[in-house]
Amino acid sequence: MVNYPHKISSQKRQAPPSQTKNFANRGMSFEKMINATNDYYLSHGLAVIHKKPTPIQIVRVDYPQRSRAKIVEAYFRQASTTDYSGVYDGYYIDFEAKETRQKHAIPMKNFHHHQIQHMEQVLAQRGICFVLLHFASQQETYLLPAVDLIRFYHQDKGQKSMPLGYIRENGYRIELGAFPQIPYLDIIKEHLLGGKTR
């Protein structure tokens, strides 16, 4: 192997190993943006909103070495409700976040009956409840109030997806920014609270 100036090797470059597609964390970039937004709100004293942990029951753990324990069998203890909850200006906040690669709709299979029931219960207690929807292929993000999701869920049970047109008509578009990345509190304050705070 000969090194040329600027440390360029004469050896043929090997192609990087092919990567298999992993769809498990398909929504992670959107989730990371929400988490960064929530961190911003927390550090600036605007809101305290956290991601809810998923309740998991660990069944079996392998200990090949004491420092390398590996969970090999686990299951969900109970169905989780929504992704995030917290407090903003004395109001309870509860919301779900969904990302899709589809251009014109969000699949309704992403919303489970127990989640709809939970949202109904939050609204019955006068909490603020909504869904953040991100259309990755179009880079469009919306806040859809829970009442509109629930109405669609009950009226159109046979439909497999919620059209983007319905979301645009009933939701609020969020322009993505730098700090915070997803300024959803602006929508809550202006549209869901009518500009007033406590």
UniProtKB/Swiss-Prot annotation:
Catalyzed reactions per annotation: Endonucleolytic cleavage at a junction such as a reciprocal single-stranded crossover between two homologous DNA duplexes (Holliday junction)
SUPFAM superfamilies: Restriction endonuclease-like
Keywords: Cytoplasm, DNA damage, DNA recombination, DNA repair, Endonuclease, Hydrolase, Magnesium, Metal-binding, Nuclease
Cofactor: Mg(2+)
Cellular location(s): Cytoplasm
Bias type Polar residues, positions: 11-23
Enzyme Commission designation: 3.1.21.10
InterPro entries: Resolv_RecU, Restrct_endonuc-II-like, tRNA_endonuc-like_dom_sf
Site positions per UniProt: Transition state stabilizer: K98
Name this polypeptide is given: Holliday junction resolvase RecU
Cofactor notes: Binds 1 Mg(2+) ion per subunit.
CDD domains, A to Z: RecU-like
Gene assigned in the entry: recU
GO cellular component, one term: cytoplasm
